[in-house]
């Protein structure tokens, strides 16, 4: 009964993800109908925002526009696959706290202990699940525009670095980082 109750309303599509033959996780973030007024009336087109990830540290997003919804989704998925970026993960969570933004959208992501789950809203949740983060605390502030939230989240995740990468940049060993 409790499982049925959870599947009603806005939560029913929350965990909807598609695994395609190549092992990528595809998430549909938003579909929007846009109208253009012309002499003969209104012309409707659709936009789709999607996120694609491998669940192991790669993620990309795409934005497609077309006269029909399935075509817009297909275009955005293709674009997302072309724009994959790598993210350094630490056993299913982040290495450190991340603050970033795009436009007026601001995102804050913090590593969480095992068993916490993905505590994030809408567009951020889709990106974090697609990249393979299992435990994270996240908050979006400012604009909640899905496109800008996805851009800010991907930008923040790709800028995050593991201690090994920081040590390699500085020409040191990981053990030397905290000791000057």
From Swiss-Prot:
Where would I find the S5 DRBM domain in this sequence?
24-87
- A single GO BP: translation
Which terms does the record give in the GO molecular function aspect? rRNA binding; structural constituent of ribosome
Q: Which InterPro entries match?
A: Ribosomal_Su5_D2-typ_SF, Ribosomal_uS5, Ribosomal_uS5_bac-type, Ribosomal_uS5_C, Ribosomal_uS5_N, Ribosomal_uS5_N_CS, Ribsml_uS5_D2-typ_fold_subgr
Kindly state one GO CC term assigned in the UniProt record.
Answer: small ribosomal subunit
Q: Does the keyword Ribosomal protein apply?
A: yes
Keyword rRNA-binding found: yes
| Swiss-Prot/TrEMBL keywords | Ribonucleoprotein, Ribosomal protein, RNA-binding, rRNA-binding
What is the UniProt domain comment for this protein? The N-terminal domain interacts with the head of the 30S subunit; the C-terminal domain interacts with the body and contacts protein S4. The interaction surface between S4 and S5 is involved in control of translational fidelity.
Task: Write down the HAMAP family for this protein, in alphabetical order.
Answer: Ribosomal_uS5_B (MF_01307_B)
Give the family from UniProt: Belongs to the universal ribosomal protein uS5 family.
Subunit architecture: Part of the 30S ribosomal subunit. Contacts proteins S4 and S8.
What is the protein's known function?
With S4 and S12 plays an important role in translational accuracy.
| Listed name of the protein | Small ribosomal subunit protein uS5
């Amino acid at each position: 009964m409790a499982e049925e109750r959870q599947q009603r309303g806005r939560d029913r599509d929350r965990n909807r993800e598609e695994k395609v033959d190549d092992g990528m996780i595809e998430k549909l973030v938003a579909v929007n109908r846009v109208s253009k007024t012309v002499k003969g009336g209104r012309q409707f087109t659709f936009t789709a925002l999607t996120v694609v990830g491998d669940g192991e540290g790669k993620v990309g997003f795409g934005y497609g526009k077309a006269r029909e919804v399935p075509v817009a989704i297909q275009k955005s998925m293709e674009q997302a696959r072309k724009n994959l970026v790598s993210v350094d993960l630490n056993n299913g969570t982040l290495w450190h706290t991340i603050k970033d933004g795009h436009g007026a959208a601001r995102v804050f992501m913090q590593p969480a202990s095992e068993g916490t789950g993905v505590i994030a809203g809408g567009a951020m949740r889709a990106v974090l699940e697609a990249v393979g983060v299992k435990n994270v605390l996240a908050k979006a502030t400012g604009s909640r525009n899905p496109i800008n939230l996805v851009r800010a989240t991907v930008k923040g995740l790709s800028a995050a670095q593991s201690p090994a990468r920081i040590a390699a940049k500085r020409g040191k060993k990981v053990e030397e980082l905290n000791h000057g």
